[in-house]
């Protein structure tokens, strides 16, 4: 007869009517019993012949997560003009005095961040935007291009102009300006001015003056630079070696490399094409010629280039006869002025050699499960985390549940701050640009690659045999709808583009590490600046705690102003005030301890509701289930040990079958959650020790001993001794000399014993006692006569590696008398 749930509970000693612990508990360590129970609950039977189940509720295998849904009305989020101040260390020092070594080191790591992988694989531009939504190809293409354009405008991306130069928007950092141009370094004379050396044409300098308000010194600079070494270099290295499908960047930046013999008449239309702010009457009158001007490479490049230069694909439709009712020329003729073929940033810098390729693909998804109106860009740089050349990312400490509870479980009022676009605060060195490239090959190649009726001839370097091969009803309808959204930007977005990251991207394993270092350093500074405040962060989640609500509000204002002065952007709409129970990292933390948040409890209920019994479940789905159950395991009676059968099946990559008893056992475990309480410091007065044959306890002046029926492995014996000490004395601080018991990981013990011990020792704190000093050592060896003196061993709760204690300075004595006695200013308060 299979083991019933009631019997199983009694076996695990979870019921009160169990016999004496000293007899019952050692039985659970018996290998035979564990094997029989495993067979009864069908836990050991890993080889099954029935087909596996691949979906349980919302859980599918790890590698086939739910299919994202495309939303044609996604809004591209706006990005504030994020510019983290370069002298952030000085600013903090002005605010709080000298920084500690740790804070300084962490802030130096991100000013600027560096990324140098050993090996980078370059992919063709066609792979730039992933065809993630086959039904909505064109729509997804333009939405993604618009998102990338928004990031570039916000100063988060560089735009590759030529192999060695890039342009960007926003405020430059010093490491972006001091880059070497040719043989000499070119320092910008006045900030905010285009660092592109003007070519000697009066017309051009006029344009630049009017657009950028150049100071007089810049004119002198222009004359000085005409015979620069790098305009000579440009003539030596042809800029013409371009991969197919990428148009020459001749329209703007490359003009500077043109040899001085290039006539003014050649340069002015190019300038006009590049900057629509200049009057465009001439361009409108002869739209056909504008195209030709537009793509003329500099004369130097043209002389050495054998390849034909292709005119702008989009504008070519203007002069061609419509091929049908759905010809793209109808759309192109909607507007006279489609604007420039390319845009250029406010600043140009020199970069290491960057090929016209991408290193990762991008696509859009919902911003988060609760916000499907806005999109989020997913960047896939997974090439750096796999294969032979994978980068092993730095590890960093994340506080475990007990440390977090020790730290944050208190009677404080809490609020959490939301850092907007946290990753995009941290600047990357331009030298990382060649490794982090995204982009697209332009609409023509994107559509051609994916549509069936058009053919690409590679020997023609990506030209189409016939311009109208593209025209199709689907494309026409999509573009017409998109025209209502994007207007003349359709032209700009249909061109190829290559962008590199200027701030750290989310798809690289280095980014979470850098973000964690950055926010923890900032919180450390805040804690020292405001001694009565507890500031803590995990990634971009920053929480502030204070003794009273009034104090918290004034702190909030002061801390917000401090963060804004460093250039950190907060999202005021998302500031949450939690009262006395803080919601953080998926937990609710209050003075009583911590519990999982409601949405996780809801997920647990759903999971058990849909969990099939007696059906083999694919081990990948088990991974998902264990992920959820593992998060809440510390709040259950038996903890992680209860999940060991599941872990075992995942490790052996076998299907797992839930028996009704095991499911009922887990269900009861997870429907009654117990808070994890804060550990309190105290003195240890109860000690336990064991040998393979016997155990001994020392409680105050009392000594006890006992023997096991059969010799046991030493770790098992030590665990049993600790359980006896806890049940006999009721003390929640125990001394032991066994490191495994000390670690409170009971997953390596016999399964039943691990489950029972977890419940008996729940909420117990352990102190390490060296064997030589352990008062329970003698009784465990059967010697009761000798009494070693009891040690005075203090227990201090740990906050893990989250070093926090900035000791509060004493409060000045001349405070006015009417300060309320509960005011945090009156008592120098230290974190719990």
From Swiss-Prot:
<keyword id="KW-0511">Multifunctional enzyme</keyword>
<protein>
    <recommendedName>
        <fullName>Protein P</fullName>
        <ecNumber>2.7.7.7</ecNumber>
        <ecNumber>2.7.7.49</ecNumber>
        <ecNumber>3.1.26.4</ecNumber>
    </recommendedName>
</protein>
<keyword id="KW-0548">Nucleotidyltransferase</keyword>
<dbReference type="InterPro" id="IPR051320">
    <property type="entry name" value="Viral_Replic_Matur_Polypro"/>
</dbReference>
<feature type="region of interest" description="Disordered">
    <location>
        <begin position="275"/>
        <end position="305"/>
    </location>
</feature>
<keyword id="KW-0808">Transferase</keyword>
<dbReference type="GO" id="GO:0003964">
    <property type="term" value="F:RNA-directed DNA polymerase activity"/>
</dbReference>
<dbReference type="Pfam" id="PF00242">
    <property type="entry name" value="DNA_pol_viral_N"/>
</dbReference>
<keyword id="KW-0695">RNA-directed DNA polymerase</keyword>
<feature type="region of interest" description="Spacer">
    <location>
        <begin position="178"/>
        <end position="335"/>
    </location>
</feature>
<dbReference type="InterPro" id="IPR000201">
    <property type="entry name" value="DNApol_viral_N"/>
</dbReference>
<dbReference type="GO" id="GO:0003887">
    <property type="term" value="F:DNA-directed DNA polymerase activity"/>
</dbReference>
<keyword id="KW-0460">Magnesium</keyword>
<keyword id="KW-1113">Inhibition of host RLR pathway by virus</keyword>
<keyword id="KW-1090">Inhibition of host innate immune response by virus</keyword>
<feature type="binding site">
    <location>
        <position position="418"/>
    </location>
    <ligand>
        <name>Mg(2+)</name>
    </ligand>
</feature>
<dbReference type="Pfam" id="PF00078">
    <property type="entry name" value="RVT_1"/>
</dbReference>
<feature type="site" description="Priming of reverse-transcription by covalently linking the first nucleotide of the (-)DNA">
    <location>
        <position position="63"/>
    </location>
</feature>
<keyword id="KW-0235">DNA replication</keyword>
<dbReference type="InterPro" id="IPR043502">
    <property type="entry name" value="DNA/RNA_pol_sf"/>
</dbReference>
<keyword id="KW-0238">DNA-binding</keyword>
<dbReference type="GO" id="GO:0006260">
    <property type="term" value="P:DNA replication"/>
</dbReference>
<feature type="binding site">
    <location>
        <position position="541"/>
    </location>
    <ligand>
        <name>Mg(2+)</name>
    </ligand>
</feature>
<keyword id="KW-0899">Viral immunoevasion</keyword>
<keyword id="KW-0239">DNA-directed DNA polymerase</keyword>
<feature type="region of interest" description="Terminal protein domain (TP)">
    <location>
        <begin position="1"/>
        <end position="177"/>
    </location>
</feature>
<dbReference type="Pfam" id="PF00336">
    <property type="entry name" value="DNA_pol_viral_C"/>
</dbReference>
<keyword id="KW-0540">Nuclease</keyword>
<dbReference type="InterPro" id="IPR001462">
    <property type="entry name" value="DNApol_viral_C"/>
</dbReference>
<feature type="region of interest" description="Polymerase/reverse transcriptase domain (RT)">
    <location>
        <begin position="336"/>
        <end position="679"/>
    </location>
</feature>
<dbReference type="GO" id="GO:0052170">
    <property type="term" value="P:symbiont-mediated suppression of host innate immune response"/>
</dbReference>
<keyword id="KW-0378">Hydrolase</keyword>
<dbReference type="GO" id="GO:0003677">
    <property type="term" value="F:DNA binding"/>
</dbReference>
<dbReference type="GO" id="GO:0046872">
    <property type="term" value="F:metal ion binding"/>
</dbReference>
<keyword id="KW-0255">Endonuclease</keyword>
<dbReference type="InterPro" id="IPR043128">
    <property type="entry name" value="Rev_trsase/Diguanyl_cyclase"/>
</dbReference>
<comment type="similarity">
    <text>Belongs to the hepadnaviridae P protein family.</text>
</comment>
<dbReference type="InterPro" id="IPR037531">
    <property type="entry name" value="HBV_DPOL"/>
</dbReference>
<keyword id="KW-0945">Host-virus interaction</keyword>
<dbReference type="InterPro" id="IPR000477">
    <property type="entry name" value="RT_dom"/>
</dbReference>
<dbReference type="GO" id="GO:0004523">
    <property type="term" value="F:RNA-DNA hybrid ribonuclease activity"/>
</dbReference>
<feature type="region of interest" description="Disordered">
    <location>
        <begin position="186"/>
        <end position="229"/>
    </location>
</feature>
């Amino acid at each position: 007869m299979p083991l019933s749930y009631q019997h199983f509970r009694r076996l695990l000693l979870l019921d009160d009517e169990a016999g004496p612990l000293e007899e019952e508990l050692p039985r659970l360590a018996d290998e035979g019993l564990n094997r029989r129970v495993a067979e009864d609950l069908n836990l050991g039977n890993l080889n099954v012949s029935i087909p596996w189940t691949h979906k349980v509720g919302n859980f599918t295998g790890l590698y086939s997560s739910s299919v994202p849904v495309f939303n044609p009305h996604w809004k591209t989020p706006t990005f504030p003009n994020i510019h983290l101040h370069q002298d952030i260390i000085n600013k903090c020092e002005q605010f709080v005095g000298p920084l500690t070594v740790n804070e300084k080191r962490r802030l130096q790591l991100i000013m600027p961040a560096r990324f140098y992988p050993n090996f980078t694989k370059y992919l063709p531009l066609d792979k730039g935007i992933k065809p993630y939504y086959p039904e909505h190809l064109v729509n997804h293409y333009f939405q993604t291009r618009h998102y990338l354009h928004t990031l570039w405008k916000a100063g988060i991306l560089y735009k590759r102009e030529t192999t060695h130069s890039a342009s960007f928007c926003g405020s430059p950092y010093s490491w972006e300006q001091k880059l070497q141009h040719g043989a000499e370094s070119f320092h910008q004379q006045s900030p905010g001015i285009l660092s592109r050396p003007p070519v000697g044409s009066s017309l051009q300098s006029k344009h630049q003056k009017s657009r950028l308000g150049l100071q007089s010194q810049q004119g002198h600079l222009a004359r000085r630079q005409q015979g620069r070494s790098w305009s000579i270099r440009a003539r030596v290295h042809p800029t013409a070696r371009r991969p197919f499908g990428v148009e020459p960047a001749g329209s703007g930046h490359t003009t500077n490399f043109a040899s001085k013999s290039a006539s003014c008449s050649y340069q002015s239309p190019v300038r006009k094409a590049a900057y629509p702010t200049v009057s465009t009457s001439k361009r409108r009158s002869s739209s056909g010629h504008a195209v030709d001007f537009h793509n003329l490479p500099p004369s130097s490049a043209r002389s050495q280039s054998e390849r034909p230069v292709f005119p702008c694909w989009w504008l070519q439709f203007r002069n061609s006869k419509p091929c049908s009712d759905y010809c793209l020329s109808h759309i192109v003729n909607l507007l006279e002025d489609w604007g420039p073929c390319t845009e250029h940033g406010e600043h140009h810098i020199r970069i290491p050699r960057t090929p016209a390729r991408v290193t990762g693909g991008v696509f859009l998804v919902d911003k988060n499960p609760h916000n499907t109106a806005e999109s989020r860009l997913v960047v896939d740089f997974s090439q750096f985390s796999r294969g032979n050349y994978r980068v092993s990312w730095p590890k960093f400490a994340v506080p475990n549940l007990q440390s977090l509870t020790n730290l944050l479980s208190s009677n404080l009022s809490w609020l959490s701050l939301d850092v907007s676009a946290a990753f995009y605060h941290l600047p990357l060195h331009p030298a990382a640009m060649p490794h982090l490239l995204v982009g697209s090959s332009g609409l023509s190649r994107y559509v051609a690659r994916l549509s069936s009726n058009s053919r690409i001839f590679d020997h023609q370097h990506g030209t189409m045999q016939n311009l109208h091969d593209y025209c199709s009803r689907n494309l026409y309808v999509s573009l017409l709808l998109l025209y209502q959204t994007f207007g003349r930007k359709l032209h700009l977005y249909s061109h190829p583009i290559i962008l590199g990251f200027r701030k750290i991207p989310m798809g690289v394993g280095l980014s979470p590490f850098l973000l964690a270092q950055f926010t923890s350093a900032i919180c450390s500074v805040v804690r020292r600046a405001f001694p009565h405040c507890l500031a803590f962060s995990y990634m971009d989640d920053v929480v502030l705690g204070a003794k009273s609500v009034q104090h918290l509000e004034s702190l909030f204002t002061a801390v917000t102003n401090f963060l804004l002065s460093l250039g950190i952007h907060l999202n005021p709409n998302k500031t949450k005030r939690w009262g006395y129970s803080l919601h953080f990292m998926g937990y609710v933390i209050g003075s009583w301890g911590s519990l999982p948040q409601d949405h996780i409890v809801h997920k647990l209920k759903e999971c058990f509701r849909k969990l099939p019994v007696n059906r083999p479940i694919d081990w990948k789905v088990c991974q998902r289930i264990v992920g959820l159950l593992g998060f809440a395991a510390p709040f259950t009676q038996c903890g992680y040990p209860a999940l060991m059968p599941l872990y075992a099946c995942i490790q052996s990559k076998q299907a797992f079958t839930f028996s009704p008893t095991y499911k009922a056992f887990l269900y009861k475990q997870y429907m009654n959650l117990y808070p994890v309480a804060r550990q309190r410091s105290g003195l240890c007065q109860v000690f336990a020790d064991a040998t393979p044959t016997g155990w001994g306890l020392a409680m105050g002046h009392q000594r006890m001993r006992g023997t096991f029926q059969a010799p046991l492995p030493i770790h098992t014996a030590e665990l049993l001794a600790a359980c006896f000490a806890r049940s006999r004395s009721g003390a929640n601080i125990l001394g032991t000399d066994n490191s495994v018991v000390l670690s409170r990981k009971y997953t390596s013990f016999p399964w039943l014993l691990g489950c029972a011990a977890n419940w008996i020792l729940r909420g117990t704190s352990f102190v390490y006692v060296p064997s030589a000093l352990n008062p329970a050592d003698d009784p465990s060896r059967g010697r009761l006569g000798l009494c070693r003196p009891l040690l005075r061993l203090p227990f201090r709760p740990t906050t893990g590696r989250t070093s926090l204690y900035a000791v509060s300075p004493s409060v000045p004595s001349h405070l006015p008398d009417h300060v309320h006695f509960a005011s945090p200013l009156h008592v120098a308060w230290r974190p719990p």
